[in-house]
From Swiss-Prot:
UniProt record similarity statement: Belongs to the RRM half pint family.
Disruption phenotype: Pupal lethal; larvae are slow to develop and die shortly after pupariation, displaying melanized patches of tissue. RNAi-mediated knockdown in germ cells does not affect fertility.
Protein name as catalogued: Poly(U)-binding-splicing factor hfp
Pfam families on file: RRM_1
Disulfide cysteine pairs (residue numbers): none
Amino acid sequence: MGSNDRASRSPRSDDQREISDMPATKRTRSDSGKSTDSKIPYLSQPLYDLKQTGDVKFGPGTRSALLGLLGGALPKLSSEQHDLVSKAKKYAMEQSIKMVLMKQTLAHQQQQLATQRTQVQRQQALALMCRVYVGSISFELKEDTIRVAFTPFGPIKSINMSWDPITQKHKGFAFVEYEIPEGAQLALEQMNGALMGGRNIKVGRPSNMPQAQQVIDEVQEEAKSFNRIYVASIHPDLSEEDIKSVFEAFGPILYCKLAQGTSLHTHKGYGFIEYANKQAMDEAIASMNLFDLGGQLLRVGRSITPPNALACPTTNSTMPTAAAVAAAAATAKIQALDAVASNAVLGLSQNTPVMAAGAVVTKVGAMPVVSAATSAAALHPALAQAAPALLPPGIFQAPTPVAPSLLGVPAGLQPLQAVVPTLPPPALLATPTLPMTVGGVGVGLVPTVATLAGAEASKGAAAAAALSAAANNAAVTAANLSENIKKAHEKQQEELQKKLMDEGDVQTLQQQENMSIKGQSARQLVMQRLMRPVDSRVIILRNMVGPEDVDETLQEEIQEECSKFGTVSRVIIFNEKQTENEDDDEAEIIVKIFVEFSAGAEAMRGKEALDGRFFGGRRVVAELYDQGIFDQGDLSG
């Protein structure tokens, strides 16, 4: 009985002994149908939160070119290295913000200068549009007669009549300046050829009008987009409602505004009306011009200036400092993200690795990749002593496996002194004059490993590892290059500001005479002065006539005389007042006559023929005039 029991139990004990000798994984699979208590249970889900307890060993997988791109096999950073990475990121972002802020400031200043220049030209053009020339005036007429005849078209600002102290009479012409350009335009249209004092007067634009003709054309073209009419000679007792009730019979009116007078309930006798369509505007002009309203004949014409054309330019508003810095930071961040995406795509689009004897060398675009030995040296100072020099950009070298040593010195190697890298980080030498941004973190001092745009989880790890490895190597050269980079930044900013100021200057003849050559533009300016001048097609005639001899037939006579030497394109008669005060009536006036031919040879023949000739008892002085200055509308030479 007892022997049979022992015999029956012995096979079971052998089975248990065999099961105990099996591995845990096999034991679990063999008893899959039973509930067993295994020491290592089956993992149904992958583990994401893993803690590193040992050192990272570099195996054959480190030879892959995608290792650096995908952020694999990266060492764990110490707290000190994390601080260095944070400082590098902060410094790089500050430099990027400074550069973007400087560019924004220069662009804003350039825009302000262009706006000011445009406003000045516009104001000068509008001032010329307010003036008309009145010639062939009878010597019996006085200034009061001229004022009464031209007042119905708009308020007159000033009347400048030439006066001869010898004969005690005026010289037969005058300049009438209105407060608004529409008054001068109506006077030009309706008073030219009118009979005054037994003579038909001549009304036209001043002779210096062509130099601003381009801006004037732009203003008039802009005014055509508005269906506005100008109404003058309005009775003082009529109000805006009265004028609107009369003119709204031609069509719907958008607004009706009379110019405010000296008091609250008075007006200056003119106003503007804007219709909803062009047809109503044309009908109002045709029907209401010279219409008797309240005992005064209305003067109605189309407006030649847009609304608020005479308004003073607003002061240039500057962006608040906080807003400018925030905008610069946002711009720098976007540029960094764009760099991450472009570098990642560039790295993946390159060829496959090429095997070489002794080492594996891989071309990875133009991005510097940190070697594994350098990354290991960041964690182990002992390994940093034997770390190789940084390779040129785009070269990746596989490390030699090193057995760990308890003493901190690799086995099989003699203790060596610290080796200084023979090549500085490529980013420090590639662009020394600009803040350097690397990858997607905006670091401007050291290169980083580019990552895929979609691999958000590996961005931070890859950038941090590359920064920590290269930060130690960059410390050697950063001290020497920091001063050079600072000087380069200052030099570039100075050049940009100087170029901006040079573009904003409007050089007249007087400024060109007092010009001094300095700075980097000296060579260019000297070469420009030594270049062969362009053949001029313009001659200037001085001392040909006096201000009293200028009339409506003078231009035709000069053009007919100069036609003997070639084809005359145009003749400009310019009255230059020898004072800066435009309202000074006693200032001396010099008449300059500019004649433009179709060819330079014709201008030379005209200059040689007319120079020294006598015209009306005066000795004419004929000279060639600079073509470039003439094309710019500068007649002050």
